[in-house]
Amino acid sequence: MKTERILGALYGQALGDAMGMPSELWPRSRVKAHFGWIDRFLPGPKENNAACYFNRAEFTDDTSMALCLADALLEREGKIDPDLIGRNILDWALRFDAFNKNVLGPTSKIALNAIRDGKPVAELENNGVTNGAAMRVSPLGCLLPARDVDSFIDDVALASSPTHKSDLAVAGAVVIAWAISRAIDGESWSAIVDSLPSIARHAQQKRITTFSASLAARLEIALKIVRNADGTESASEQLYQVVGAGTSTIESVPCAIALVELAQTDPNRCAVLCANLGGDTDTIGAMATAICGALHGVNAIDPALKAELDAVNQLDFNRYATALAKYRQQREAV
């Protein structure tokens, strides 16, 4: 069953990413005016300078970088090698011509340029607060058992370090990875979500590097909005206006957790709600829908959407899921 949930997390990541791609980085008002309502895969509009490179049902840098991380984990048989993760991401960026397209976030671009110049990951500052670590962390949530919080945070920090080392970026990645890992263990969403603010607080305060607002407090605000809102549209509007749906970890991670709650953990519903939110739709979609997929397993993903993702992206997620499940079991036995 854990392999099915791991597969669900990987497909959830790709589903949320590809569904949210056409509207990414557009204001909510423009998403509504241009699309009306997104409820299926669409090509990136030529007017969207972040999405114009992508065809219908293609995922973006979020899932591509998650697979760079997964490849590094498989190559090292479940061990975390930050320099290999960094090289994999750089190789993908060069293949995709990501430096010349409006695809890389500012923190990742600076870090990858330094890696390209031969700097070891350990020497990079990488104190940015954008969401590049959280957006790609799902394979790590599949690998790491959610037992000892401190060692979990350390592992996530190590895997994030090629591009992001700040307290906030690491805490955001920890929240997403912890939720996925607990889901793979079969925990209920209500138990998982109640634990996330304290996990976020612990992760953010472990090594303070910024003067950021509290991720734990923002998670609580986002969840309160969803629980008190009068319907889905009102909840989405309030999340967008109050919490924010931007590329910063402090906005996008609380938004993603709140959208899992709003979608009642249904991965297909979650991907649609994220795509219509406005802002960093593909990244919020990738994070939130990965959690939903981990909660319910791959069979909860709409078979038609899954088939389209497979056909367009030439996916072999089964190979990743089998290997990650094996390496997770080895870690659980220690």
Swiss-Prot record:
Keyword Hydrolase: yes
KW tRNA processing (keyword) present: no
EC code: 3.2.2.-
UniProtKB keywords: Hydrolase
Single GO molecular function: hydrolase activity
Disulfide bridge map: none
Family to which the UniProt record says this protein belongs: Belongs to the ADP-ribosylglycohydrolase family.
PANTHER family: ADP-RIBOSYLGLYCOHYDROLASE, ADP-RIBOSYLHYDROLASE ARH3
Official protein name in the record: Uncharacterized protein YegU
Species assigned in the record: Escherichia coli (strain K12)
